[in-house]
Design a protein with these regions (language model features):
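N-terminal subdomain of nucleotide-sugar transferases
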Residues: 2-16, 21-70
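Conserved nucleotide-sugar phosphate-binding/catalytic loop shared by glycosyltransferases and other
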Residues: 32-40, 57-111, 254-256, 341
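Active-site-proximal region of nucleotide-activated glycan assembly enzymes
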Residues: 62, 88, 147-205
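Donor-nucleotide binding loops and adjacent catalytic segments primarily
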Residues: 66-80, 85, 203-204, 208-290, ...
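An amphipathic, basic-hydrophobic alpha-helix
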Residues: 97-130, 148
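Acidic donor-binding loop of glycosyltransferase active sites
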Residues: 129-130, 285-300, 307-308
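A short, well-ordered alpha-helix in the C-terminal region of glycosyltransferases
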Residues: 359-373
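C-terminal alpha-helical cap of glycosyltransferases
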Residues: 373-388
Length: 388
């Protein structure tokens, strides 16, 4: 079975640093090598960036993070997640333009000029030995200005279909890595950077040994939640007799928890509801079946754990890249894929009732065969090679 969601850690307080400024500052040794990590927007960009940032710090690097600040009402995810982990947080004013109206596009040249200038200020102040771009629109102005200022640029593309920013930056980057094969010309296929917890879980056969009773179901909608899954899953579970119903943990996304709670109450179904999952690796390992979207990080994490997944790709994903992500595992027997338009409460209820744990073990085993677990180490090695 197959999915999307990228998990998230609970959001600590957002930083209040001004645009072009630095929020949290690390205490590091004088003369340490310096990396500037550019990533933002969603967990799919941020969590791989954190994996690399933490590994670099463990090797004595001083790491700064460049992202967007968001607004007072809706701070960016990176401004919430990065500073509490001890990294200096820099911000510039730039966000996505794809699908925006004509007014936003009309002001794009001015916004770009401002973002270019802010990026120059950040790069000059931080003085990085290496700049790493892990996606998000924020990477475009900062990546271009880094190269203009003579800095080495390392890129990583998480998805099976390259994003617009990386398509542009690949021509000026020193090293390019991808999570899936054949995504960018002359790139090295290494998989997605992972936090160590995902590679330390017992294998599927060991985890499933001795499990009996109702299935343990985990529903994750990614770092931003998934309204369609929040609406559909409670209705499907209500169609299953209570004595045969799975034991459910459902991650809602920060802004959708109350709506999800109302959906389960209306369906008369009990479930553990949470806006975020702090330890996603353990949650994947504990579940018999994960219902999720098919963001690149989620697919990578599913493979690393060897979890069984039902992927429901986000239908509005750019270039339908979530379907392509999911097929990387599903085509090898490492999960199941159902498009959102084809998934009804009745169909999901039927699938859950007929699913056997033995089949889920096989999904997990096949998914695990597709894992690549050295992406973080290879990106760190590239940075150290460049910085010599």
């Amino acid at each position: 079975m197959t999915s999307q969601g990228v998990l998230s850690a609970g959001p600590p307080q957002a930083s209040t640093a001004p645009s072009g400024g630095s929020a949290v500052h690390e205490v590091t040794s004088v003369g340490a090598r310096v990396a500037l990590v550019m990533a933002g927007g969603t967990g799919g960009h941020i969590f791989p960036g954190l994996a690399v940032a933490e590994a670099l710090r463990d090797r004595g690097w001083r790491v700064h993070w460049l992202g967007g600040k968001g607004t007072a009402l809706h701070p960016s995810m990176e401004s919430q997640l990065v500073p509490p982990r001890g990294f200096a947080f820099e911000s510039i004013d730039f966000s996505g333009v794809r699908g925006k109206g004509p007014v936003t596009l009309a002001f794009l040249p001015l916004r770009l000029l401002k973002a270019f200038w802010q990026s120059i200020q950040v790069v000059r102040r931080v003085k990085p030995d290496v700049v790493l771009g892990l996606g998000g629109y924020i990477s475009f102005p900062a990546g271009m200005m880094s190269v203009l200022l003579g800095k080495s640029l390392v890129l990583h593309e998480q998805n099976s279909v390259a994003g617009l920013v990386n398509k542009v930056l690949v021509g000026v980057a020193d090293r390019v890595f991808t999570a899936f094969p054949g995504v960018l010309k002359n790139a090295e296929w290494i998989g997605n950077p992972l936090r160590p917890a995902f590679t330390r879980q017992p294998g599927p056969e060991a985890r499933f040994a001795g499990r009996t009773g109702p299935l343990r179901l985990l529903v994750v909608g990614g770092s931003l939640g998934a309204k369609a899954l929040n609406d559909l899953v409670p209705k499907a579970l209500a169609l299953i007799p209570a004595n045969a119903r799975p034991i459910v943990t459902h991650q809602s996304g920060a802004r959708q928890l109350e709506a999800l709670r109302a959906n389960y109450q209306a369906a008369g179904v009990q479930a553990e509801l949470t806006p975020f999952i702090e330890d996603t690796a353990q949650a994947f390992a504990d579940a018999d079946l994960v219902i999720c979207r098919a963001g690149a990080s989620t697919v990578t994490e599913i493979a690393a754990v060897g979890a069984a997944a039902l992927f429901v790709p986000f239908p509005s994903a750019v270039d339908d890249h979530q379907t392509t992500n999911a097929k990387f595992l599903v085509d090898q027997g490492g999960g199941c894929l159902i498009q959102q338009r084809d998934l009804t409460p009745e169909k999901l209820a039927h699938l859950l009732q007929k699913t056997e744990r033995s089949a889920l073990v096989n999904y997990g085993l096949e998914a695990k065969k597709m894992q690549k677990i050295d992406a973080t180490a290879r990106m760190v090695a590239a940075c150290e090679e460049i910085a010599r």
